[in-house]
Amino acid sequence: MKKILTIFIMLLITAAVWAGEYTVQKLPNGQTVVVYPIKDNPIVTIDTWIKTGSINETDENNGVAHFLEHLFFKGTKSHPTGDMDRILESKGAVVNAATSKDFTHYYITIPSEYFDTAMELHSDMLLHPQIPRKELEKERKVVLEEIAKDGNTPSKKVYDNLNDMLYTKHPYKRKVIGSADIIGTIRREEILDYFNNYYAPSNMITLVVGDVDTEKAIAKIQQSF
């Protein structure tokens, strides 16, 4: 599903570039915004890409980008754990995220009438994650289970072995999901250090595709971030 949505968004942007109907703007905070209005259906996708992934990790914190991605959905100072999920689900939203070697991205697809609410929650999640220790330990178990599952998947093992042969010294050698040894022991402070280093608006690209007014969408992003 994550791969399908990523391809879908990129196809939309490619189509926008071809048609010349998209708008790209750099905000005063350094954030890049891309807006492509499509009025065919009353729906909109907000997708923020952070220019960081496992390539920006070290051998000591490998897997932190993916682990942090899981933790962004665990509440903020304004919205306790579960509150955002409740609000967005009540409005028919689809929310997800993905981490790769080069980037991490988070998206919301929602009826366009709730665009302002979605953008406010989206920015709050990306800028003010709370990462409660209790939730961190829950997600630690989830990620460790994912690592164990990957270790028992033949196709994944083939990919990892090929990756090891191709990248012996390059940062691409690191697995996006990390290792059980590191994920099992990494501290909350280390995760927050990574967040503080890379999750600034100047390191983000926010795409808005769907039933929106370009100027209003850009103004809302600037207000929210």
PLM regions: where:
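Sec-dependent N-terminal signal peptides
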Residues: 4-14
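Boundary at the C-terminal end of the N-terminal hydrophobic targeting segment
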Residues: 17-21
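Charge-rich, well-structured scaffold segments of protease-associated domains
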Residues: 26, 84-225
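M16/MPP (pitrilysin/insulinase) zinc-metallopeptidase core fold and M16-derived inactive scaffolds
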Residues: 40, 45-109, 175-177
